[in-house]
Amino acid sequence: MSDDLRLSRRLLLAGGAGLTGAALGLGAGARAASGPPAPSVPADTGAVQDGRIVFPNWRDDGDAPPPPPPAPMPPSERVGFAIVGLGRLSLEEILPAFGEAKKARVVALMSGSADKAKLTAAQYGIPADAVYGYDQWDRLKANPAVKAVYIVTPNGLHRDNVLAAAGAGKHVLCEKPMANSSAEAQEMVEACAKAGVKLMIAYRCQYEPFNREVVRLARSGEFGRVKMVEAFNGQTTGLPEQWRLRKALAGGGALPDIGLYCLNGVRALLGEEPVSIQAQIVTPENDRRFKEVEESVAFTMRFPSGVIAQCGTSYGVHESRELRVHTTSGSLDLHNAFAYRGQRLTVAHREGSHVQRDEPVLTHKNQFALELDHMAECILTDRRPRTPGEEGLQDMILMEAIYAAARTGQPVTVGPLAGTGQGTDATRGPALEEGK
């Protein structure tokens, strides 16, 4: 190879823009004829702009531009979280999600199991003196690194832990369902407001890209008006000893655990509140798993816009998590809608004389990292969370209406949460920015 054509690393760095026309000995006319104009930042090394590293789009018009590189905050500037409760969800999903978070970090643990907490702390580099028992809120309060707590205990313990966190002056991210009753949820909202701390309910699907795209498409009117919605979330359950089958700890069975995703998902999709609810509950007899809680629930909601939503949930079926939106000129089918991962969206609509079925390709993101970063951003910018306590309170009220409708066999009249008004998304904070 001729020395004139050998590109060294020094030449590449000196050229700044990578394989520019100058480096290849090409004139300006040749460059213009062979491709798009030179980018405003170096093609291969990128540049720092507004505190971020940016690269120009290196693909041609036939492909979508790649996303920008991640821009995590320095660890010392991220919001420190204490995880309260070290069960399956914390250990399998939430703690690993901090590795993908950009604005949040885990700095403390609270658990009733000292051995488990000690081992987990060692695995995640958490100091031994930042590990607490459930009766050590005063010690946690004194830890300045803890700005927020994530409550991941059984549902029946949410109220007490949220009140303790608020009393400690810590912002609160609480798992769903918010509580065991609307009265408890109301108390939690009031306690956090009085303490001047933020309260967010962990409705992860409202932050997940595919669910957000369904909401965007449904509300855009691109495929006409939404007329009907179907939502189903079901799975089998075993181990009669687990806390989810004990009413005092769970508050109910399939409905508050997994059926809540259908209820909240439809509300978030439409941005309005139902006006009436009908429901049925079926629980197998002589099954010791369901001595205290229900197995299967079907409920129908009618909305002011005329939309009818048919929802179902069960602890007795093969895993299925589906959301389907029917509009006047199309349909949106979200497979694995409420799962931790694996979402797939199909959009059907008329295209001339035939039906077109599209599958938008979106970037899958860790839902727990997304909600952690949203809470962190709300703390850093003093912003109301998208899914605040009022969002969880309204769901508690509506679930009580579902149980009442099933018990009486009669429709139950419902409406907006008191004090929130009649507007769209009345129980929610500001809309999420696109791409976040």
Label every model-predicted segment:
Residues 105, 356-360, 378-395:
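Glycine- and charged-residue-rich phosphate/anionic-cofactor binding loop of Rossmann-like
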Residues 187-205, 224-228:
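Rossmann-fold dehydrogenase core element
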